Amino acid sequence: MNLQDHFLIAMPHLEDENFQRSVVYICENNEQGSMGLVLTQATDLSIAELCAKMNFMMADEREYSDKLVLLGGPVNLEHGFILHKKTAQEFQHSYKVTDQIYLTTSADIINTFGTAQSPEKYLVTLGCARWEPNQLENEIANNDWLVVPADENILFDVNSSERWFAANQLLGIEHVNFSYQQQMEHS
């Protein structure tokens, strides 16, 4: 099963602080391993503040997003990753995840923020998550993750603090079911 364009939903027993109660969007999954972005851990830095820190043109006529930058995972924390809807403009370092979703790592996309050339929908992360070949598949087999096809609404429109619950609901799972299960396991 190719996991690209799928959500990984952390099971409640997953205690790694990088992935606890997380949803990860898988951008790439092949024989060389997997790469994804954690969608549930907001930083205290807004996208507008990130643009200012990076000395991009902060023109008055632009409207910058007040959305928060996400902590995309424990790897490459010094690198930004922008997941976005397809645009008419091509960017220097973009990877096609699906026909409509791209991952861009070049700064030229940031210069479009607040303009008509900006992607209609996007999110910004610092860092990413990576797995060695077969590592992710083994974690799934060990019941660390649930897997569901990605949902663009959850990806771009749901608040990061609500994505874990929303992704679980794609599978018909309510968070109260997990709470009951955990209580039974600890009794």
UniProtKB/Swiss-Prot annotation:
Belongs to the UPF0301 (AlgH) family. InterPro entries: AlgH-like. This is UPF0301 protein HSM_1900. GO terms for cellular component: cytosol.
